A protein has these predicted regions:
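Short, Lys/Arg-enriched N-terminal segments with co-localized hydrophobic residues
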Residues: 1-6
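Feature marks short, highly hydrophobic, charge-poor N-terminal signal-anchor/signal peptide-like helices
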Residues: 9-11
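Hydrophobic membrane-insertion alpha-helices, especially the h-region
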Residues: 15-29
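N-terminal membrane-anchoring alpha-helices
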Residues: 25-39
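An N-terminal assembly and electron-transfer interface module characteristic of large anaerobic redox
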Residues: 35-558
Length: 558
């Protein structure tokens, strides 16, 4: 059979399964608690801010918009036509013009230097900017309106070279080993390590090695120049893209930290350990500053070793990464759950630890006490069995009462997203309660937050951990490249994903989210009556998916 026939037959089978389960879902709906449909008010933005994102991926752009909406912030993005599209970089000149025209109109702007300099994160892995390009951008950034606050961020290149670079990627292991050895020699001065470094260098073509080194040299030069622009109203943040505790990215971070200390810029410049989540962290920091609120967060780990665990693609251990993000946002660590505004429940599943019913019951007890809990659900091997969520579902934990949830593939991405959601939700709730908001507005906030949580569950757990691995296998079996989808294959793949996630949304609603009230006040209980999802692939690959979640709410007098 041809590839087209196989895909068509597969789509028909999926459609039939969807139809059967849709009917089953309608029947299951009868099992949900009865409630009267409720039309909730849409949240009204209190302020607009500007975001020039790291790239066009939803997690860097539209997700930040959704987080902002939780806190009453309208996040303005550049026109989509200006932004990157997978292998096509952003139109840097148009982006700069957009920024120059709009920056002075808003009190706060979050600006990715990598998008302006390279055209996005993927382009930054492929392109080495010239000193002339760097100096020109630094000059443009310096000329932005000083009367408006800016948060500019730049990302240190990752340890591994891009898979798109040939022949560079053929020497991936040798380059990684070279990077780590070079840093260890810098730290220790060891003669034995120096000898091993020289042997490793000899295995790499000179042009490939020079290109690899130049990426960090260019990054160091630009970042140290960016450091000079730091003021109280122009904050600078440096991130690390897919790093490790040792390597050239670590050496670059040490240079930046030394310069920050030497120039006494600790209040104006920060270093953090991630990339995709930086805009969400900076959004949260601005909100907390505007609210004059320094929340306290209690860090609770599912296992004794989790705090000191080294997770994949992280430059520091779990505890250090969390404290770094709290400091960056302007939050502090609480010593007890009772003194905290938010509990950060941290799961780091790995070969030695998998969560069980014990952890699920512990989390439910926290929710029963009325604690606001943000769940960071991380897996060292990117396996569903290492996550908390399956245990929560199996033990009927009230997931709809979580303040936040995230389970990205990289720990800092998960922690940054969950902390941002949890703090923005708790902060906005605090504002509304202080202002004496009515029950309807409070319910609308709880419902909006649950909508965001449902989206993260559907993407981080159901898509990334369950659908994505099998989808990759199916595509490869049909001779389709999962990271280079043709237009027709992309459409059929989107249909497949839509069917799978629609079923999971129905199941999630009827098995958990819709079975208990997500909010109760003044003798009224508020339930999730419906949950549906729209899906598409933002780029011609299956690595990420763009979701739009819709929910309906009902009320019941208890």
């Amino acid at each position: 059979l041809s590839k087209d026939t196989l895909m068509r037959n597969s789509s028909k089978i999926i459609f039939m399964i969807c139809s059967i389960l849709l009917i089953s879902g309608i029947c299951l709906r009868l099992a949900l608690p009865s409630s009267t449909p409720l039309r909730l008010p849409q949240p009204t933005p209190t302020q607009s801010i500007l975001l020039l994102p790291l790239d066009s991926r939803p997690v860097c752009s539209t997700m930040v918009q959704k987080l902002g909406a939780l806190a009453g912030l309208n996040v303005i993005l550049p026109p989509k036509a200006c932004l990157d599209n997978y292998r096509t970089p952003s139109d840097r000149q148009k982006l700069l013009q957009w920024l120059q025209i709009n920056q002075s109109k808003y009190d706060y702007s979050i600006i990715s230097a990598d998008n302006l300099l390279h055209g996005g994160l993927l382009a930054a892995r492929m392109n080495t900017a010239t000193p002339t390009e760097e100096d020109a951008l630094l000059k443009h950034l310096q000329q932005l309106s000083p009367a408006k606050q800016q948060a500019i961020f730049s990302v240190i290149p990752r340890l591994l070279v891009s898979d798109q670079l040939l022949p560079d990627r053929w020497y991936q292991y040798q380059l990684m080993r070279y990077s780590q050895l070079a840093d260890m020699v810098r730290i220790t001065g060891s003669f034995a390590l120096t000898q091993e470094l020289r042997r490793t260098e000899a295995k790499i073509p000179a042009k490939v090695l020079d290109k690899y080194r130049s990426r960090y040299q260019q990054s160091d030069r630009f970042n140290l120049g960016l450091l000079q622009l730091a003021t109280d109203d122009r904050q600078i943040t440096f991130g690390q893209d897919d790093a490790s505790p040792i390597g050239l990215p670590h050496a670059s971070a040490v240079k930046i930290q030394s310069s920050i200390a030497a120039q006494k810029l600790q209040q104006q410049v920060q270093l953090t350990y991630g990339a995709d989540e930086i805009a969400s962290l900076l959004l949260t920091r601005y909100y907390l500053q505007q609210s004059s609120w320094q929340p306290k967060v209690y860090l609770h780990y599912t296992s004794p070793k989790a705090e000191g665990a080294d997770m994949p693609y992280m430059a520091v251990c779990v505890g250090a990464a969390l404290r770094n993000q709290l400091k960056l946002m302007g939050a502090s660590e609480a010593s007890t759950p009772d003194s905290a505004d938010l509990i950060c429940y941290v799961n780091c599943g790995n070969d030695d630890f998998r969560p069980s019913a014990k952890q699920a019951q512990e989390l439910q007890q926290m929710l029963d006490k009325g604690y606001k809990v943000a769940l960071i659900d991380s897996s060292a091997n990117f396996e569903a069995e290492e996550l908390m969520l399956p245990q929560l579902l199996a033990n009927n934990v009230q997931i709809n009462k979580l303040a936040a949830y995230a389970a990205w593939n990289t720990f800092s991405n998960s922690s940054g997203t969950a902390l941002a959601q949890g703090l923005l939700f708790c902060g906005r709730l605090r504002q509304l309660q202080t202002a004496g908001a009515d029950t309807e507005r409070l319910t609308a906030l709880y419902a909006a937050n649950l909508n965001f949580t449902a989206e993260r569950i559907l993407e981080d757990y159901y898509y990334q951990k369950l659908v994505h691995p099998k989808l990759r296998q199916k595509l490869e079996a049909f001779g389709i490249n999962p990271v280079e989808l043709a237009s027709e294959d992309k459409t059929k793949t989107e249909q497949y994903i839509q069917g799978k996630l629609s079923l999971q949304a129905y199941k999630l609603l009827h098995d958990n989210l819709g079975r208990t009230p997500f909010y109760q006040q003044n003798g009224h209980s508020y339930y999730l009556r419906d949950l549906s999802v729209g899906t598409k692939l933002p780029w011609a690959r299956i690595f990420e998916v763009e979701l739009q979640v819709w929910t309906d709410t009902g009320v019941k007098t208890e």
